[in-house]
Amino acid sequence: MYLILIKKYQYNLLLILMVVVVSLMLGCDSDYTQDDSNLNSALSSDTDITPNITPSVSVKSGSFKDSAVAGINYVSGGETGTTDSDGTFKYEEGGTVTFSVGGVVIGSGPPSAEMTPVDIVDGGSEDNQAVVNIARFLQTLDDDGDPTNGIGISSTTSEAIKTTGKSIDFNVDATSFSENTDVLDVVQKVATQTGREVELVSETKAKSHLQNTVM
């Protein structure tokens, strides 16, 4: 009797067994496909990652001279400050450095170990009028009026200039610079705030001193 029943349901049992086997195979294949997809996704994600590398910047020291000039502000990339008694400033190599006094920008240019007014004017030279006017301005602001021992610009002088809110155009002829109301207002304000006599240094005197500095 059992043999008869087995024969009777033999076909059904084989069919069920085949369905189970196929289902297991499909399940394994699905898991493999999913794992493969996850692996490909991870690899793709890793490939797309770009390292965020910031190039290092070389910071060096230089000196600004018309004699050593102390008390002028400088900006070179992330480097900012005020020159010391040796005219020392810091700069980012390959960038630009800008100098100012009391908010008055005197010039900018490619930085180097030693700079003078010649280096902060496009096409600058000892005879360039803008260069000479910058030298006149800096020598006028010298605290003791004797640029041969260095030019020192005090914080009081810088603050006096800042209160005027003036900007100065150095790219003019000697006469126009001497008569410029902005220049004269700054000179007068410095004299008032420091309590000393201040007169705009002549073109001849400023140029002579500058030439001795550059030589």
Per-region residue spans from a language model:
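N-terminal secretory signal peptides that target proteins for export/translocation
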Residues: 1-10
